[in-house]
Swiss-Prot record:
One of the GO biological process terms: L-histidine biosynthetic process
Gene Ontology CC, one term: cytoplasm
InterPro entries: HisE, PRib-ATP_PPHydrolase-like
Subcellular localization: Cytoplasm
Name of the featured protein: Phosphoribosyl-ATP pyrophosphatase
Chief subcellular location: cytoplasm
Reaction equation(s) it catalyzes: 1-(5-phospho-beta-D-ribosyl)-ATP + H2O = 1-(5-phospho-beta-D-ribosyl)-5'-AMP + diphosphate + H(+)
Pathways per UniProt: Amino-acid biosynthesis; L-histidine biosynthesis; L-histidine from 5-phospho-alpha-D-ribose 1-diphosphate: step 2/9
Enzyme category, top tier: hydrolase
Any GO molecular function: phosphoribosyl-ATP diphosphatase activity
Family (UniProt): Belongs to the PRA-PH family.
Primary gene name: hisE
Species: Pseudomonas fluorescens (strain Pf0-1)
PANTHER family named in the record: HISTIDINE BIOSYNTHESIS BIFUNCTIONAL PROTEIN (PTHR42945), HISTIDINE BIOSYNTHESIS BIFUNCTIONAL PROTEIN HISIE (PTHR42945:SF9)
Top-level taxon of the source organism: Bacteria
Length: 110
């Protein structure tokens, strides 16, 4: 895993036990999963809008910025659920070289 993701995961874990007023992340943890999920949804929409704008303008700087926000809040969500980002990277590694059609067919039915 990249050093940046490792360092961020460590900071997110450290902030779990911090006072709500000590940091933005600590305040999210204190507000609970629903607030964190709200932020993930908000950042998802902002990323989509930035991508649509970039397709027209050719400037991807906002896409990068919004994707960073989306990844960040997704990592907060994972940490709140007791998961480490390495689990996501492991899942991507598992899928590497696997046809998307095969991977989708192997998922349990809902």
């Amino acid at each position: 895993m990249s050093d940046t993701l490792t360092r961020l995961a460590q900071v997110l874990e450290e902030r779990k036990g911090a006072a709500a007023d000590s940091s933005y992340v600590a305040s999210l943890y204190h507000k609970g999963l629903n607030k964190i999920l709200e932020k993930v949804g908000e950042e998802s929409v902002e990323t989509i809008i930035a991508a649509k704008d970039a397709a027209v303008s050719g400037d991807c700087s906002d896409v990068i910025y919004e994707t960073a926000d989306l990844w960040f809040h997704s990592m907060v969500m994972l940490a709140q659920l007791g998961q480490h980002p390495q689990a996501v990277l492991d899942e991507l590694d598992r899928r590497f070289g696997l046809s998307g059609h095969v991977e989708k067919a192997s998922r349990p039915s809902a």
